[in-house]
Amino acid sequence: RQMCIRDRGLLPSEVSTVYLPIRRKTTFLKVREFNQRCQDWKQKYQPKVFFGMDRISSASHVRLGNGSHRAYLSRMIEASLYSPIRKFLNPLHRSILRIEREMFENPYLEKAIANSYMVKGEIVRDYSIDPSKITVIHNGVEWKELAPEFENWVETKNKIAQSLRLDPHIYQFLFIGNGYSRKGLLPLLEGLSLLKERNYHLSVLGKEKNMTPFKMRVKALGLDSHVTFFGAQTNPLPFYKMADSLLVPSVYDPFANVTIEALAMGLFVVSSKYNGGKEVLTEETGKMIDNLFDPDSICHALQLALERPKTWISSELIRNSVKKFDFSLQLQKVIDVCLQ
């Protein structure tokens, strides 16, 4: 029998749903309460498979879509985006770290599914867990469903560019991410400013609470005419069609979904080494930034991307490189792991 434990939201009618209402108001207390309620439910009903999509200390199987919180905090501190003192004083971080440790070191944990080898390595490094318990299954993409959108990018590019007031005849970079600091936009702008070739444009998509420092940096670097902030977009497909390459300069990303989405739409991808999605790139489909905090290193990767504008032939090659990651295939792998 399929069961799903949730504190909110809707699921298909064929899935039986157990709601565990959360009464606490404070975020860190909500995290603790939900974890405890899951433990209580498991102890009462003793399911054969207790699958967690997030951190719950009593899971028999868990998919680590958010990666390792400990590794995330370490990267943010290393990048000077977070204070070590806040890490230890913030009760939410302490709560998540405690649950994370209990989850990985739980003797009843049968399998953990990481979405990148990067994440698996971080967990093995930081926790007492048998590496054989961790299976890597990269994120999937709706490869088949995206086919109609991909196939008309050539004929629709000019119209899309016109609607966005962009020039379809120059090289188009694309950045998509929520929280520009963690997604590495500032170092990206530094590298972008070093390009000798100025026949390019960068479209920035995603949510950001404080846009001011990013817009100020664009102006200070003399990139006003080369960068446009489009904010959050419910449908990024027009931007994928219009762009030549996607830039993923993440400070920490277990596996940025935009990496494989862009590949499925035929875009060359430039990624930092802190994005687990880099593992699906090849020499023909992408380039890794050697040092995210060295502007010259970023500039070098961007220059290589500029030399590979999107064509019908190149886009087909790039798209076909991720056919094996079709969502249905990756989902079946997850199911198979749980039923072993």
Feature roles, as predicted:
Residues 1-5:
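Short, small-residue-biased leader/transition segments that mark boundaries at the very start
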Residues 118, 140:
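Carbohydrate-associated surface elements
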Residues 171-194, 209-212:
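A conserved mid-protein helix/loop that constitutes part of the nucleotide-sugar donor-binding site
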Residues 232, 251:
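Aromatic "clamp/platform" in nucleotide-sugar-dependent glycosyltransferases that forms part
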Residues 256-259, 277:
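Short glycine/serine-rich donor-binding loops of glycosyltransferases
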Residues 268-271:
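Short hydrophobic beta-strand element within catalytic cores of glycosyltransferases
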Residues 310-339:
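A charged, aromatic-enriched C-terminal amphipathic alpha-helix characteristic of glycosyltransferases
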